[in-house]
Amino acid sequence: MQIYMVGGAVRDRLLGRPVHDRDWVVVGATPEQMRAQGYLPVGRDFPVFLHPATREEYALARTERKSGRGYRGFVVHSAPEVTLQEDLSRRDLTINAIATSADASGAGCLIDPHHGARDIAARVLRHVSTAFREDPVRILRVARFAARLPDFTVAPETLQLMREMVAHGETDHLVAERVWQELARGLMAEKPSRMFEVLRACGALERLLPEVERLWGVPQSAEHHPEIDTGAHLLLVLDMAARLQAPLAVRFACLAHDLGKGSTPADMLPRHIGHETRGAELLKHLAERLRVPADCRATADKVAREHGHIHCSNALSAAALVRLLERCDALRLPQRFADILLACECDARGRLGFAESAYPQRPRLTAALAAAQSVHSSAIAAQAAARGLAGPQVGALIRQARVAAVAQWLASQ
């Protein structure tokens, strides 16, 4: 039995990045031998075990053979005679196909049959072999790695292979959960814009997220958007979200906030009247198709519908501010409202020349919410009940009190 550290841990060590998770491959062993040594089997599709002490993953060396279309169309073969070189050859990118005989201390020699260390030094994402084309998820992984390692470029031959896979319809067979998983990881990467640039370059964005692809080539008012192109604006917004270390729900909201601009009638351009409502409907279909988690979907819906009003909120009256808070469900879900405001700040600063600009709407609306929250609604409801009032009448009294509290706060500014 021989054990090697493989994949991301080796790659990140060569890049000088922190190593958070280590993966290991075991050559020359059977599942029975692994269990006999105390390893806990956890793999469903192929033999993976957890180390009895470290809980790190140890996978038996394996090969994969294409048996059908899409992500799940594979036959996996794992046996003691499968070599380390065979296991490395099934991997997607050369930078991920490096092993080391290192122990936990990190000492040891590299086993690098596909010259991944050379590609790391050259900052290139390159496929290991033409077997890359057997798994369409690898298109998403390359795009995600481009976002995680933004100083890397995709090798021309790899990009061409990705284009051919898209043209042959391989991305049409991806399962929604896997698309969302890779999309979410790309959104949370260092430079999310790179993911979408790579997906556009190979044609996959049009097949997977046509609502997003349609934003390119759509002009906006140069007065408000010096970058003009809506797609260019989207990339700036996504990278601003990464810069501000926004959570996933905010980054997805940034991705989806302007979808309605892709369907603006040509005779209306560069104005986009009503794009908020159109965008919310497109978002609904996109989120259902990809099975986006409920928290991401809800935050994105509010941002799509309300970002224009939030941008203009500095001029709103107390009554209008309270109505905005109610539409955003801010009093019931203040943390989600904070996420909505952060997404709007990313939108405002994700414009050419505005990256360092202040966004006073965010602290202003946060303070307005605090003023509205200072109203003791339960006390008002009890007083109203004592007067024989109920239902909408009680709600109206609470709203009046919140408007008064916000008005008092406005007067103090």
Curated annotation (Swiss-Prot):
Monomer. Can also form homodimers and oligomers. The gene is cca. This is Multifunctional CCA protein. CTP binds at G8, R11, R91, R141, R144. Keywords: ATP-binding, Hydrolase, Magnesium, Metal-binding, Multifunctional enzyme, Nickel, Nucleotide-binding, Nucleotidyltransferase, RNA repair, RNA-binding, Transferase, tRNA processing. Comprises two domains: an N-terminal domain containing the nucleotidyltransferase activity and a C-terminal HD domain associated with both phosphodiesterase and phosphatase activities. InterPro entries: CCA_bact, HD/PDEase_dom, HD_domain, NT_sf, PolA_pol_head_dom, PolyA_RNA-bd, tRNA_CCA-adding_enzyme. It comes from Verminephrobacter eiseniae (strain EF01-2). ATP binds at G8, R11, R91, R141, R144. CDD domains: HDc, NT_ClassII-CCAase.
